[in-house]
């Protein structure tokens, strides 16, 4: 049993051109090609949250869309970014717990 809460958000680019994905508050920017789907995973120190929220309390994520870009505000204490096969897109060490592949 883990001692932290985990939240997962899938982001897909269903358009015909690349999108800029920015993960805040780290200002990490990545280019998502058309038809790509990525997972953003974050962790909270407590097993059931709480998440600080951006506009409303207890929300692990906030998503803002602008033409050509998507910004995801992560309200946990770290994040992992991977594709749908759990291959790391951002391998930076954000002091997150090790990811365990799901079966």
Features from the language model and the residues they span:
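Basic/polar N-terminal segments that are highly enriched at the extreme N-terminus
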Residues: 1-2, 103
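Asparagine-centered strand-capping/turn motif at beta-strand->loop junctions
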Residues: 3-15
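Residues that act as N-cap/strand-start positions at coil-to-secondary-structure junctions
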Residues: 3-5, 24-26, 57, 66
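Short loop/turn positions at the edges of beta-strands in beta-sheet-rich folds
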Residues: 13-15, 34, 66
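Short, structured beta-strand/loop micro-motifs enriched in basic residues and often containing a Trp
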Residues: 16-23
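Histidine-centered metal-chelating micro-motifs
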Residues: 18, 38, 69-70
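Intrinsically disordered, low-complexity Pro/Gly/Ser/Thr-rich segments with frequent PxxP/GP/PP motifs
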Residues: 24-47
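Terminal connector regions
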Residues: 43-103
